[in-house]
């Protein structure tokens, strides 16, 4: 009898084996080839199960997400979040933002800062931002030791140090995921070549903001000869890059570069996204490998706005929703060698975004005021970071205050 009593007492614990279940949503997880209505169970910081029908009785808390899309937490690999510790001394002195201010409300759980800091100031960046943010923040080191202190200072060849940069990247390999070359003005590839050298030494990819398009250093040469497989060309739809041939199709060199394994990142930003390139290439099936924002205080208050808006632009140009999610989750995670991110699978960290695909008539802008229209847009409904609900747009996780079992603070 005593044994039976013990077993009966244990039944509720056995029955409620999950802390949380997101129930009835349409899961899109490109990495694991899931594109169907599924329930997602979570225990602690991890995904515990993904299945067609998890009984509600097995969960302590159930959130109805029927009619919504459940995706891996968005990975934005181009967002400037380093504001510096000395006023006016880095990109952030004027235009970077604190990651938690905008990440979760847009479904983003991981941000990669591409080159706001270099080997001279990265330790401060890690101490003040990376280690304190609730958002997962990763970084690419600028090959210029001063980072984005000023574009003029990024031209100093004596500050482009592959050995020191690679050494720091190896020392912080848990958060440093690449090397960045940016804003190079000279008629040569020195900055890019130094970044590639550092990337080889540290075994990490390189991201290049090509800067000015000079005939002495053709963009075609960079993506077909200078960059390695796995390296990334950001601002990939920035005019006047010669990406479209006379018939409106992808230029042959672009196809060759992709075949080599070079990755193309959106990096929308405040001046680097033009429908004149993006629409014909997207309609031709040349989708970006990664969709990213180039988020900073100017771009977030201009045409770019945020990650869901940027993703919605590609929906409006004809990119299928599954491919938009792929380019915003598993692809960028893989590009920065963090393949464990960007997925919803048993045992994976429970970084999850829940979106509503709103129907209507919507307009979207590029950086010079060009407009397209589309019938859909993504709206963030909920975000979970490591199993915790960190954003809940419509209060789906709450209970009615009049009848719910709520705990009020003691007087």
Locate each region found by the language model.
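His/Asp/Glu-enriched, well-ordered alpha-helical/loop segment
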Residues: 276-359
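N-terminal signal peptide c-region/cleavage motif recognized by signal peptidases
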Residues: 10-12
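C-terminal cap of metal-dependent C-N hydrolases
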Residues: 349-403
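Sec-dependent signal peptide recognition
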Residues: 1-7
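Divalent metal-dependent hydrolysis catalytic cores, especially in the metallo-beta-lactamase
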Residues: 98-126, 134-151, 172-187, 203-207, ...
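Metal-associated gating/positioning segment near the N- to mid-region
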Residues: 60, 64-131
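Histidine-rich, glycine-flanked metal-binding segment
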Residues: 17-20, 27-73
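Active-site core of metal-dependent hydrolases
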Residues: 178-301
């Amino acid at each position: 009898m005593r044994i039976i009593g013990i077993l009966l007492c244990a039944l509720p614990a056995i029955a409620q084996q999950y802390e949380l279940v997101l129930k009835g949503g349409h899961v899109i997880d490109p990495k694991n080839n899931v594109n169907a209505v599924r329930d997602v169970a979570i225990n602690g910081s991890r995904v515990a199960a993904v299945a067609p029908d998890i009984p509600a009785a097995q969960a302590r808390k159930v959130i109805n997400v029927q009619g919504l899309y459940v995706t891996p937490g968005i990975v934005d690999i181009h967002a400037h979040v380093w504001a510096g510790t000395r006023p006016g001394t880095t990109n952030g002195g004027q235009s970077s933002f604190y990651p938690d201010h905008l990440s979760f409300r847009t479904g983003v759980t991981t941000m990669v800062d591409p080159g706001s800091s270099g080997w001279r100031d990265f330790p401060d960046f890690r101490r003040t931002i990376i280690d304190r943010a609730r958002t997962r923040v990763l970084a690419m080191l600028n090959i210029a030791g001063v980072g984005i202190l000023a574009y003029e200072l990024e031209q100093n060849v004596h500050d482009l140090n592959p050995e020191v940069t690679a050494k720091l990247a190896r020392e912080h390999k848990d958060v440093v995921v690449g090397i960045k070359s940016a804003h190079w003005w000279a008629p040569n590839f020195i900055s890019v070549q130094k970044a590639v050298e550092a990337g080889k030494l540290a075994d990490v990819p390189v991201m290049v903001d090509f800067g000015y398009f000079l005939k002495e250093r053709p963009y075609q040469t960079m993506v077909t000869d200078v960059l390695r497989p796995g390296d990334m060309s950001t601002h990939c739809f920035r005019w006047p890059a010669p990406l479209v041939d006379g018939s409106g199709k992808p230029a042959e060199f672009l196809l060759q570069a992709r075949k080599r394994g070079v990755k193309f990142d959106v990096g929308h930003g405040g001046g680097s996204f033009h429908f004149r390139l993006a629409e014909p290439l997207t309609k031709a099936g040349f989708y970006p490998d990664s969709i990213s924002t180039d988020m900073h205080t100017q771009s977030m208050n201009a045409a770019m706005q945020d990650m869901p808006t940027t993703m919605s632009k590609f929906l409006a140009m004809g990119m299928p929703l599954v491919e938009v999610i792929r380019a915003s989750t598993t692809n960028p995670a893989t590009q920065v060698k963090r393949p464990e991110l960007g997925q919803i699978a048993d045992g994976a960290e429970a970084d999850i975004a829940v979106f509503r695909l709103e129907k209507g008539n919507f307009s979207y802008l590029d950086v010079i005021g060009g407009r397209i229209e589309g019938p859909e847009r993504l709206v963030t409904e909920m975000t979970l970071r490591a199993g915790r609900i960190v954003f809940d747009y419509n209060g789906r996780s709450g209970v009615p205050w009049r009848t719910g079992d709520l705990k009020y603070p003691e007087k």
